Design a protein with these regions (language model features):
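Glycine-rich, aromatic-bearing surface loops/beta-hairpins
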Residues: 24-36
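A general secondary-structure signal for short beta-strands and their flanking turns/coil
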Residues: 34-38, 93-95
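C-terminal motif of bacterial Sec signal peptides marking the signal peptidase cleavage site
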Residues: 14-17
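Mature extracytoplasmic domains of secretory-pathway proteins
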Residues: 57-95, 101-106
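Helix-rich interaction surfaces within compact, conserved domain-sized segments
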Residues: 90-139
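Bacterial signal peptide processing site
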Residues: 19-21
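Terminal, regulation- and interaction-focused segments at domain boundaries
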Residues: 36-55
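Bacterial N-terminal signal peptides that target proteins for export
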Residues: 1-7
Length: 139
């Protein structure tokens, strides 16, 4: 019992000097004026009922809805979504990932949410996943 107590005390002493690594944010590590926000949106290409969203339909969405809101540019990736459904079956869906680098401002937020809403409505989608993170950008 005394050995066990001694070992625990030694472990506490050793661990007392340990600290969790600090989480550096983009503000901490970015050079002046190059901090931005990066938002990646994930768009499924399967309709709940009917044909898959075509390449032409996707490109029309990008050209007419995305680009006018993000004139400085964007990047599109082909992606494949996968998840385990409530029925225990693996579901897979071809997808598109849209990466936007933008300021952290109200207009960008409005534009991003508009894109999500337009896509869900136009293509009968349940959701458009959104992932945000601070980034350092240089051109």
């Amino acid at each position: 019992m005394m050995i066990k107590t001694g070992l625990m005390a030694a472990a506490f002493v050793l661990l007392a000097g340990c600290t969790a690594p600090s989480q550096n944010t983009a503000t901490d590590i970015c050079k002046a004026d190059n901090q931005m926000q990066q938002t990646t949106l994930y768009f499924g290409l399967n309709r709940p009922a009917g044909a898959q969203i075509t390449g032409n339909e996707w490109q029309q969405f990008v050209d007419q809805d995305v680009t006018p809101r993000f004139r400085d540019g964007l990047t599109v990736f082909d992606a494949r979504g996968q998840w385990l459904g409530n029925n225990g079956q693996v579901a897979r869906e071809p997808s598109k990932a849209l990466m936007l680098s933008h300021g952290k401002d109200a207009q960008s937020e409005t534009n991003i949410e508009a894109l999500r809403g337009i896509y869900k409505s136009r293509f009968a989608q349940e959701s458009v996943m959104r992932v945000d993170q601070p980034v350092c950008v240089q051109f």
